[in-house]
Amino acid sequence: MFRSCLRHCRRATVRSRTCPRCSHHEIPQLQVVQRQISLSSSFPHIRRLQTSSTDTQERIPIRKQLKQEAKAIKSRKRERREQEEASRHKWELTVGVEIHAQLNTETKLFSRAPTSPSELPNTNVALFDLAFPGSQPEFQVATLLPALRAAIALNCDIQPVSRFDRKHYFYQDQPSGYQITQYYEPFARNGYLDLFRHDGIAPEDGDRVRIGIKQIQLEQDTAKSQEYPPSMQLLDFNRVSHPLIEIITMPEIHTPATAAAFVRKVQAILQSCSAVTTGMEAGGLRADINVSVRLRGDGSGTHQYSGIGGLGQRTEIKNLSSFKAVEDAIIAEKNRQIAVLESGGVVEGETRGWTIGSTETRKLRGKEGEVDYRYMPDPDIPPLLIGKDIISALSNTLPAGPDALIDMLVGQYGLAIEDAKPLVELEDGARLEYYQDVVDILRNLQQDLDSKTQAGLGRVAGNWVLHELGGLLSKAGLAWDAERVTAESLAALIDQLQRKRITGATAKKVLAMLFDGDRRPVAQLLEEENLILRPLSREEYIALASAAIELNPQMVEQIRSKNQLGKLGWFVGQMMRMGEKGRVEAQKADAILRELILGLSQ
């Protein structure tokens, strides 16, 4: 029907051109337009058609399209950064942290049941853990020792008298209907923790920030629940009454990065003093975060926390299990609260949750207060009395903390902070101990060398322990093992390198051989594999120098006539390239060149 319309001029016209039947002119564009009589009215079963020799939409090349999309994404990110920067200057973030850490103990807090995490479910359970009628709490004194070590390491004042309270709530993970804690009279108060730039604090917090610790309290852990959708949930009561400490900060943190740095450093301190055995990565440490915002410089807020007034309404984000989750959850909740306030809304006090990889927090329930939990003294547990003698004994035997170790590595071993920090943190100090063994052995091996060489041993050993040996472990996907390459073998290898008996490439090759199981002593391995450098003779130096001189006689003339001695370095470089790698010593090569070019004998 469409073609028949084209054949009859009376049924159709051609825009900007005469009909093909009436003219021989070429028509670059053909578009049939409807006349006064609608085709759709004459032929209701046929849809209106339109043709064109060009696409109605211009096609964009895929490469250009990808560039445009990337540019748009970059623009959106820039706008988001600008908005965050603007909100940072307008709004003040306030964060308080509550850290729950499982103590390093053999028994539970109020029963003699063991705390071993590797047993089958519901096997390490006492009658009191399950709240059997008639069972009574029996405080295990040994559980107090790691708690005291933690409190001393965090600069807290140990209270001579503390008491236990009941925190009432009904949930399946707490069979007694209450948790035993120390809400009113905790065993430790008024601590603090200093954070530095190398700890990862935000740039706007400067070089150092001190975070106050309101209190540290002893309390019970709860059961571990496992969900099996759609409706099954299993409970493992092995964890019930496992001793915990809860570390509660003052609301003095104002950046997400600094909050994450605080949690990270607390974990390192607790591990260094053996207060805990596992950290966040194994579920032994969890963090709850309290977040509020207010207009910067505006102290008219109606809320007060820990004696600090003028704050905004806070929300609590529960059970964060990684340092990144702490930072990301704070950012998300801060942005949510700012959006609520800027839209004229009101921030509700509530408990919220966070899912890894999410961009928003989610509401779990309304925030309970002191009245909701109905705190009351526990009538079955007597007061906890702590004498000054035990505090003094623990303080004197407490190992050095991370800050003291970093200062020691920087001051005594000459390490950069960037190398000292991972040595302290990796493998709970095992690699630091290995490093110190390597340096001690090296110093004994190199007593005959000059003091300048010995002063640099700490930096050299740090590079080999952290980067060379650490790189082999990472590449192989293996955990730290000090016996894989013994401290004696690594020290002997570094000694050979320092004495220029082997090249750096040879040292790395030998380290790989030791790493793969070669147990020969380093000296024997180098000899049998013919890896020791043989010093070049005078004749060999002269031959290399003569060959280098022939490469550029014009430069030789410039050195002689214009005394451009700096150009001797070019010839030294040529000699090192032409000679066997690592055998040409720059100082000897320079002396031979001066002798041949300038006639100087040194």
Curated annotation (Swiss-Prot):
**EC number(s) from the headed UniProt entry:** 6.3.5.-
Gene3D superfamilies documented for this protein: 1.10.10.410
What is this enzyme's class at the first EC digit? ligase
Q: Which GO terms describe its cellular component?
A: glutamyl-tRNA(Gln) amidotransferase complex; mitochondrion
Which SMART domains does the record match to this protein? GatB_Yqey (SM00845)
Catalysis performed (reactions):
L-glutamyl-tRNA(Gln) + L-glutamine + ATP + H2O = L-glutaminyl-tRNA(Gln) + L-glutamate + ADP + phosphate + H(+)
| GO molecular function terms attached to this record | ATP binding; glutaminyl-tRNA synthase (glutamine-hydrolyzing) activity
The transit peptide is at: 1-56
Assigned keywords, A-Z: ATP-binding, Ligase, Mitochondrion, Nucleotide-binding, Protein biosynthesis, Transit peptide
Among SUPFAM superfamilies, the record links this protein to: GatB/YqeY motif, Glutamine synthetase/guanido kinase
Task: Spell out the Pfam families in the cross-references.
Answer: GatB_N, GatB_Yqey
> Where is it mostly found?
mitochondrion
Report which superkingdom the organism of origin falls in.
Eukaryota
Q: Where in the cell is it found?
A: Mitochondrion
Q: Which GO terms describe its biological process?
A: glutaminyl-tRNAGln biosynthesis via transamidation; mitochondrial translation
Q: Sorted alphabetically, which PANTHER family does this protein's record hold?
A: GLUTAMYL-TRNA GLN AMIDOTRANSFERASE SUBUNIT B MITOCHONDRIAL AND PROKARYOTIC PET112-RELATED, GLUTAMYL-TRNA(GLN) AMIDOTRANSFERASE SUBUNIT B, MITOCHONDRIAL
Q: How does it assemble?
A: Subunit of the heterotrimeric GatCAB amidotransferase (AdT) complex, composed of A, B and C subunits.
What this protein is reported to do is described as: Allows the formation of correctly charged Gln-tRNA(Gln) through the transamidation of misacylated Glu-tRNA(Gln) in the mitochondria. The reaction takes place in the presence of glutamine and ATP through an activated gamma-phospho-Glu-tRNA(Gln).
State the family named in the UniProt similarity comment for this chain.
Answer: Belongs to the GatB/GatE family. GatB subfamily.
Listed name of the protein: Glutamyl-tRNA(Gln) amidotransferase subunit B, mitochondrial
Source organism of the structure: Emericella nidulans (strain FGSC A4 / ATCC 38163 / CBS 112.46 / NRRL 194 / M139)
Q: What is the lineage of its organism?
A: Eukaryota, Fungi, Dikarya, Ascomycota, Pezizomycotina
